[in-house]
Design a protein with these regions (language model features):
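Alpha-helical solenoid repeat scaffolds
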Residues: 1-218
Length: 218
């Protein structure tokens, strides 16, 4: 699903292995490609899935290119209106339009199952951008939720997500008890000396700010 095939190679793969590739596989590949802004791949894969998925991906691709319209969203068949990729497209569009509060509420209502999201790390990127905008607006409580409720699966993305949640809790909410578990998860995920030292530093800062000095050890 992550392969960036050229059109001729894609045709060869479909010819040889098409019996093993159904609508679900083509739709998943299309969504993954759209998130990575590989528009040609996304639309070709969508076409293999059928006209309904093509309508869905046209809206998603347009949104990631800042060209989505209400008409494109309305053209998506009813069976796909609640698809996670369309939710992503709507959230992205709201954020780019600087409708940050609406984008945040839509994100909080979005699915969180990594399988449903297709590319949960790309969803984390969108969450991070929204959380930062919320901090600019002084809404640290919602920014914390946006960061803390991530579904990132990549180690680097998980570390960054847990850092953001912990940092917001510590620096903006003044809640070391809420911050400490996120810094602990950073340490659990860390795979390099640098990332581990960063996590332990912030665990120490949370402990220092805790009334009894023990939060980072939990």
């Amino acid at each position: 699903r992550e392969a960036d095939f050229s059109a001729p190679l894609e045709k060869s793969v479909v010819t040889e292995f098409g019996e093993f590739l159904g609508k679900t596989e083509h739709r998943t590949r299309a969504v993954f490609a759209a998130y990575k802004e590989r528009d040609g791949v996304a639309l070709r894969a969508a076409a293999l899935a059928g006209p309904d998925v093509t309508a869905l991906l046209r809206a998603v691709v347009a949104a990631t290119n800042d060209g989505a319209s209400d008409k494109l969203f309305a053209a998506v068949p009813a069976e796909w209106q609640k698809d996670a990729s369309l939710a992503f497209a709507r959230i992205h569009r709201l954020r780019k339009a600087n409708k940050i509060e609406e984008a945040a509420q839509a994100m909080l209502a979005a699915p969180r199952d990594p399988a449903e999201l297709v590319d949960p790390d790309e969803w984390w990127t969108e969450r991070r951008l929204i959380a930062r905008k919320l901090l600019d607006k002084g809404d640290a409580a919602t920014a914390f939720r946006i960061a803390a409720e991530h579904s990132a699966t990549g180690a680097e993305q998980r570390i960054e997500a847990e850092f953001h949640a912990g940092w917001i809790a510590l620096r903006f909410l003044n809640d070391p008890g809420k911050a400490a578990p996120h810094f602990a998860r950073m340490a659990e995920t860390a795979a390099t000396p640098l990332s581990l030292s960063r996590a332990l530093y912030w665990r120490g800062r949370a402990a220092e700010a805790s009334p009894d000095g023990t939060e980072a050890a939990r």
